[in-house]
Amino acid sequence: YFVGRNTVWVHNTECKVSDNRRRHILEGEGPDDPGHGPNRGFGNSAFPDTWSDDNAIKAVEDVANSPKSIWQQATGPGSGRNAPKTIGGPDPNAPLTTRNGRPVRFTVEGQNHSLDIRVIVEPGGEGIVTGFPINR
């Protein structure tokens, strides 16, 4: 979130998965967009079948909040492959909103139980948007 008139990122609050986003992460949005939950059969971007739904969501939250995770701006001015990568939180120079006024999103990557996980976070908006394993 930000404090005051100047755009200053403050990343001292935990990013959490809302109930709506929990359903999205685990179950997806339908047959063409299956979820990433354990035992959902979504291939290499599903959480391990040996994990519970709660384990998967905790892993997503842990990566989003880890001081070791790598953050990169994914939407808004200055986003993309050349956007700076920061460790443990968003780039303090990143804008708060896109040109359309939507909250800027960040790609956050880290590990949990030796599993590489990618999380999409809106620090100035919804918080954790989605999360899933990568490189499986």
Over which residues does each language-model region extend?
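Helix-centric, low-specificity signal for extended rod-like, repetitive segments
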Residues: 14-15, 33
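Functional cores of ribonucleases/endoribonucleases
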Residues: 22-23, 27-136
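Long, low-complexity, intrinsically disordered regions
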Residues: 15-17, 64
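HINT/intein-family self-processing domains that catalyze protein splicing or autoproteolytic maturation
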Residues: 1-14
